[in-house]
A protein has these predicted regions:
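Active-site lining segments that contact anionic ligands and/or coordinate catalytic metals
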Residues: 72-74, 178, 183
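Flexible, polar/acidic helix-loop-strand segments at domain edges
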Residues: 119-178
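Hydrophobic alpha-helical segments, principally membrane-spanning helices and signal/leader peptides
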Residues: 10, 19, 113, 162-165
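An aromatic- and glycine-enriched ligand-binding surface/loop that stacks and positions planar moieties
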Residues: 2, 16-143
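Flexible helix-coil transition and linker loops at the boundaries of alpha-helical arrays
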Residues: 3-14
Length: 184
């Protein structure tokens, strides 16, 4: 877990923003307001000293959406989800296949509502490691393990294998990742 720069580390600090994240947020505000020099300067305070603030990039892009590493070095601002009975993320239900596969996966509450365009999918080279995380075209049946192929690419970031219902996903929703700060 990333260290808090101006807070004492304790269990009660979980979910609190640290100094580096605050600077990144200020940089985004300046950028939004069109004050590009202030944005550049504020973001540089963190980007040029990322290790001091506990930020960096995961070696594996997919780690941003895994339970054990999603609150890691790239997490600047995100919505934390937990397993039931706590609040959970409904993104898996919105992205899961309902009409694009032959048959059913044996998973309830899949709506196939958040569908990326074929044009977006085609923009990713097959060698781009982000493609496998961002999109999913094959799904395993919950009970039989049979692989069912979707006729269209669907969002893959919030898909968790083995869940019996699509609306119980606990993958965090990233609002700002450290990669965004670098790009800004």
């Amino acid at each position: 877990m990333r260290k808090n720069i101006f807070l004492e580390d304790s269990a009660s600090d979980e979910g609190r923003i640290n100094k580096g994240a605050a600077k990144i947020l200020f940089g985004k505000v300046y950028l939004t307001k069109g004050d590009f020099q202030k944005a550049k300067d504020k973001l540089a305070e963190v980007v040029e000293h990322e290790s001091e603030y506990g930020f960096g990039l995961h070696k594996d892009y997919h780690a941003n959406w895994l339970r054990d590493t999603e609150a890691g070095i790239e997490a600047v601002l995100y919505i934390e989800y937990k397993e039931p009975p706590f609040q959970h993320n409904g993104e898996m239900a919105l992205a899961g296949p309902k009409y694009s596969i032959p048959g059913s996966l044996g998973i309830s509450a899949l709506n196939e509502a958040d569908i990326p365009t074929q044009e977006l999918y085609d923009q990713f080279d097959n060698r781009d490691l982000r493609k496998k995380t961002n999109f999913k075209t094959e799904f395993a049946h919950l009970k039989t393990g049979e692989i069912l192929k979707s006729s269209i690419p669907l969002s893959g970031k919030f898909w968790v294998e083995g869940l019996e219902t699509g609306d119980r996903c606990d993958v965090n929703m990233h609002i700002i990742r450290y990669a965004d700060a670098i790009l800004m």
